[in-house]
């Protein structure tokens, strides 16, 4: 009987996690209402879910608003740039319908490639902003580099995000329940699922010095290996030009973990 009501058993642990995801989802939706704040909201969402994956989370609301406040300016800047590009993509797709023949095909596939690259960058840019201190420019560059270097994980995360939407569009009943699920815990659950891959990826860029880990708080770590990791990402598989390109994309200043 004691095991049933033990707060450490799997059932209570699971229900506690579900409750946290519901609270986090509601906070995320609340902060997305002004539209312009979607960037900081996504950043804060991933800040909390990555801590959940590491079992480092404390108070959900406190952690969420801490990241929301700290990354507000950069989050808004990145989101507004992304929003402009998304709107331009939609406009181009409408204009494309007026074309015909070979030009139509070239433009169509060109826009699809751009849309895919944008989706890949957005998959990483806000989690990167949540995890590391850097400039907007370098955060965007590193998001592109990581999305290409870790392409299998990138594709998997995109599929995780897209699959529920496709299922909802194919079935009206799924659509109805899907809308409810998204409002209840959909966004936080997807971010939580993606965070398992993101934590694994980001750990490659965090020094594993045990002494440093004991002496410093995680928020104070400096990413010493970011440049080296990106420079050698193509070793044995890609050309020297790719590695040189990665060297140019990373800043001379170290990136610092938040």
Where are these regions (language model features)?
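Helix-coil boundary and N-terminal low-complexity module in membrane systems
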Residues: 1-111, 121-124, 128-258
């Amino acid at each position: 009987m004691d095991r049933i009501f033990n707060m450490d058993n799997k059932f209570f642990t699971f229900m506690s996690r579900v409750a946290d995801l519901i609270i986090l989802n509601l906070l995320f939706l609340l902060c997305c209402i002004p539209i312009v704040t979607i960037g900081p909201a996504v950043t804060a969402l991933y800040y909390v879910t990555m801590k959940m994956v590491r079992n480092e989370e404390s108070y959900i609301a406190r952690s969420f608003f801490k990241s929301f406040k700290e990354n507000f300016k950069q989050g808004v800047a990145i989101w507004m740039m992304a929003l402009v590009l998304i709107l331009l993509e939609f406009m181009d797709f409408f204009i494309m319908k007026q074309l015909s023949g070979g030009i139509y095909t070239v433009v169509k596939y060109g826009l699809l490639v751009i849309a895919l690259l944008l989706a890949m960058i957005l998959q990483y840019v806000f989690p990167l902003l949540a995890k590391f201190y850097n400039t907007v420019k370098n955060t965007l560059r590193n998001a592109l580099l990581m999305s290409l270097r870790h392409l299998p994980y990138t594709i998997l995360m995109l599929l995780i995000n897209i699959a529920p939407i496709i299922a909802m569009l194919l079935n009206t009943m799924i659509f109805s329940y899907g809308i409810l699920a998204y409002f209840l815990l959909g966004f936080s659950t997807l971010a939580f699922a993606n965070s398992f891959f993101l934590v694994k990826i980001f750990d490659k860029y965090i020094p594993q010095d045990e002494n440093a880990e004991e002496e410093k708080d995680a928020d104070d770590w400096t990413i010493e290996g970011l440049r080296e990791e990106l420079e050698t990402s193509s070793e044995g598989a890609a050309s020297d030009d790719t590695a040189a390109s990665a060297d140019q994309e990373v800043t001379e200043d170290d990136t610092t973990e938040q």
